Amino acid sequence: MDEMRTEIRISVRALVEFILREGDLDSRTTGKTDLLAMQAGGRLHRKIQRRMGAGYQAEVSLKTRVSMGEFDCVVEGRADGIFAEDGLVYIDEIKGVYRDLNLIGQPVGVHLAQALCYACIYAEREELPEIGVQLTYGNLETEELKYFRETRTREELREWFFGLMKEY
């Protein structure tokens, strides 16, 4: 008789924030309320997603199950966007900030980790040998955009993701 395995569910965002525990580009540092920042962020997300055109899949649900010995961990979330360019599929993670984008020299670690999780889940599901990751930062007041891109192999992502899961 099969015994029921304990299942733990966690969002991609909660997972990376728990493991990496680092500072964030936080809209609250300017005195803006969380609600206003969330509303502005939602508007910016939708605007960017519409601008990307018909080939851009917005708000794609992704989920994976990882056996962790005595229990299973279900990691799930929603990629802001998925698109293909020059034969490479990209996971797009959009972040709205109240900060001068010129001061952002590289992606915030938790933002990159979130995108890498989605990239790993999607590359595994679609059996892609490699996948692109794009972080799109948008200033919530000016709507100026800044992009960071990188490419990873499925094997690199798998190794990184399972290392993250071991820490969890």
Range-by-range predicted roles:
Residues 46-50, 105-135:
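Metal-dependent nuclease catalytic cores in nucleic-acid-processing enzymes
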Residues 68-72, 86-88, 104, 126-128, ...:
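Short, solvent-exposed loop/turn segments that connect beta-strands within catalytic domains
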Residues 1-87:
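Metal-dependent nuclease catalytic cores that hydrolyze phosphodiester bonds in DNA/RNA
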Residues 22-23, 27, 33-37, 73, ...:
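Long, low-complexity, compositionally biased intrinsically disordered regions
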Residues 45, 77-104, 118:
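Conserved catalytic cores of phosphodiester-cleaving nucleases, focusing on short active-site segments
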Residues 128-168:
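ATP-dependent helicase/translocase motor core
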Residues 59, 93, 114:
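Acidic-residue sensor for enzyme active/binding pockets
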Residues 34, 101-108:
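Active-site oxyanion-binding pockets that recognize sulfate/phosphate
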